[in-house]
Regions:
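Iron-sulfur-associated redox domains of electron-transfer enzymes in respiratory
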Residues: 2-181
């Protein structure tokens, strides 16, 4: 499996943000001017700030930040996996569930009650009309869909992210056994 398209064109790169803090995307931005070299060989076709309504077809590489915690996350990651050749779990939330999974031992109802009813608020109600339907537990990405590459860290360093992207641009898959460093 290679990230490089067979026709020699630029790779189609996407990033996805599920249930996480955006720290992994901040580390990606911390690659600074090195992203210019990436931009010469990859087109960013999707990301949290891209003004597109639907995740595109035929994506070569997708970096996924965050755990799968809601029905929306589950639907999104399945669609992304179906449209992506190489899926990268970026950061500890995507790899282990990390902070989003801390709620798992309490259950959805207890977490929503604590967050919206028991804390000081002017309007104590659970805003079910605006929050996505939570899954019973928050799960790492690989428990829901197959993952090809794991990039650990909370967040992973900019150097590690750039190294992984560099390997993918060269048509090499970083060793998935390096999941935990």
């Amino acid at each position: 499996m290679s990230a490089a398209p067979p026709n020699g064109n630029k790779i189609r790169l996407a990033t996805v943000w599920l249930d996480g803090c955006s720290g992994c995307h901040m580390s990606l931005l911390d690659t600074d001017e090195r992203m210019i070299a990436v931009a010469q060989r990859a087109d960013v076709v999707w990301g949290p700030l891209v003004d597109a309504k639907e995740f595109p077809e035929n994506v070569d590489v997708t970096l996924v930040e965050g755990a799968v915690s809601s029905e929306d996350d589950l639907e999104r990651i399945r669609r992304v996996r179906n449209r992506t050749r190489i899926l990268v779990s970026l950061g500890d939330c995507a790899i282990t569930g990390n902070v989003p999974a801390m709620r798992n031992k309490y259950g959805v109802d207890a977490v929503l009650r604590r967050a919206y009813l028991e804390n000081a608020t002017l309007d104590p109600k659970i805003p079910l009309d605006v929050i996505p339907a939570l899954l019973p537990v928050s799960r790492p990405v690989h428990e829901v869909v197959p993952v090809d590459v794991f990039v650990p860290g909370c967040p992973p360093s900019a150097d590690l992210i750039f190294s992984v992207i560099g390997e993918l641009l060269e048509g090499r898959i970083p060793n998935p056994a390096a999941k935990f460093g």
